[in-house]
A protein has these predicted regions:
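PLP-dependent enzyme catalytic core of the Aspartate aminotransferase-like
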Residues: 2-4, 317, 326, 330-360
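A glycine-/small-polar-enriched, mobile loop at the entrance of the PLP active site in fold-type I
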Residues: 3-54
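Active-site phosphate-binding strand-loop segment of PLP-dependent enzymes
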Residues: 10, 109, 120-176
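Conserved N-terminal alpha-helix of the aminotransferase class I/II PLP-enzyme fold
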Residues: 32-79, 86, 100, 108
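PLP-dependent aminotransferase-like
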Residues: 77-144
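Active-site C-terminal subdomain of aminotransferase-like
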Residues: 188, 193-275, 289, 358-360
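Conserved PLP-binding catalytic core of the aspartate aminotransferase-like
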Residues: 284-314
Length: 360
């Protein structure tokens, strides 16, 4: 059976070259005589894997030495609690709510202190990003939290908050590695890997070292960033397979794509094809303010919900799967992460036009 074009928001497509390499190494990795899924995390082979994965991430993202990297189980949702447990030293933090996940992060933080929602785009169903330069931030906030790309509603920040003395914490789950990021603008960057990096089962956090070591004594051991980072993510058994796959994807980005600047050009070209088509007809509609349209997650609707269902069903039959929009939005969503080839976008647009002509 031929591979489909998978537009899932996550878990999502992985580069075919990476999958083939993982397939080739599945039974026997290097000279270990065993699979990565079987080997001890204390073995010399896995030690080399995790060390090289971190080193490659530092190169690809240009992460300075005074930032620490941790590989965590629990996904980005667990980070919603870890962030306030580790960083809310003043008892309060500022949250900008631009969608479902930033809202969930704020609700989780409110269990541990004062989570001030200083701005929200809920008034227009999260179809824009508030002006980060016009927000009344709290000077005594421990940090400012954002979700930099909103998977469900299809928006992205065009600039990020910068408040002197208040670190910025960003959930980058659905846009990480899609373009270069100035890491020094952030106190902490975290992301689940299942959207743009690797199979589900892990989150990665990149943390400025001056923010570490401030968690209260009663914070559970495995919810303390310092626990894992001081042990090089090996305090307990790490998600070995995810780390291995992350390493393969990073090397693919570095060696085959040529880095994140090239990846950004490819991604923006892919998104332009789809958005240009959406803007050139009146059967489908994208509700997002143009300036804030996500490069990774493109949302659209047809004339009515029944037509949306018909579209998704016929698209799946044609080899375009997981286009159904999130239940909070409806319609359709094409998640076009790094691994989605340009031909997948071109063929999707061709299908959309044929469907439009048949149903207009």
């Amino acid at each position: 059976m031929a591979r489909v074009y998978n537009f899932s928001a996550g878990p999502s497509m992985l580069p075919e070259k990476v999958l083939k390499q993982a397939q080739a190494e599945l039974l026997v990795y290097g000279d270990s005589g065993q699979s990565v899924m079987e080997m001890s995390h204390r073995s010399k082979w896995f030690d080399a894997i995790i060390t090289e994965t971190e080193a490659t991430l530092r190169r690809v993202m240009n992460i300075p030495d005074h930032y620490k990297i941790g590989f965590f189980q629990g996904g980005a949702t667990q980070q919603f609690a870890m962030v306030p447990l580790n960083f809310m030293t003043t008892g309060k933090a500022d949250y900008i709510v631009t969608g479902n996940f930033s809202n969930l992060a704020a609700k989780e933080a409110a269990k541990f202190g004062e989570a001030n929602i200083v701005a929200s785009s809920k008034d227009k169903n999260f179809t824009y990003i508030p002006d980060v330069n016009a927000i009344p931030y709290n000077k005594d906030a421990s940090y400012i939290h954002i979700c930099q790309n909103n998977t469900i509603f299809g928006t992205q920040y065009v600039e990020v908050p910068q408040v002197e003395g208040v670190p910025l914490v960003a959930d980058m789950s659905s846009m990480i590695l899609s373009k270069p990021v100035d890491v020094t603008k952030y106190g902490c960057i975290y992301f689940g890997v299942q959207k743009n990096v690797a199979p589900a089962g892990m989150a990665i956090a990149i943390i400025r070292d001056d923010l570490l070591g401030k968690a209260a004594d009663n914070v559970p051991t495995m919810m303390n960033y310092t626990t894992l980072i001081n042990k090089d993510s090996m305090y307990n058994t790490p998600p070995c397979w995810c780390i291995y796959m992350t390493g393969l994807v990073l090397k693919y980005l570095e060696n085959d794509i040529g880095g994140l600047a090239n990846m950004q050009k490819i991604n923006e070209a892919k998104a332009k094809v789809l958005y240009d088509y959406l803007d050139g007809q009146d059967f489908y509609n994208n509700p997002v303010e143009h300036r804030y349209r996500s490069t990774m997650n493109v949302t659209f609707t047809s004339p009515n919900p029944d037509m949306d269902k018909k579209f998704c069903a016929e698209a799946a039959e044609a080899g375009f799967v997981n286009l159904k929009g999130h239940r909070l939005v409806g319609g359709m969503r094409a998640s076009i992460y790094n691994a989605m080839p340009s031909e997948g976008i071109d063929k999707l647009v061709d299908f959309m036009e044929k469907f439009r002509k048949a149903n207009a």
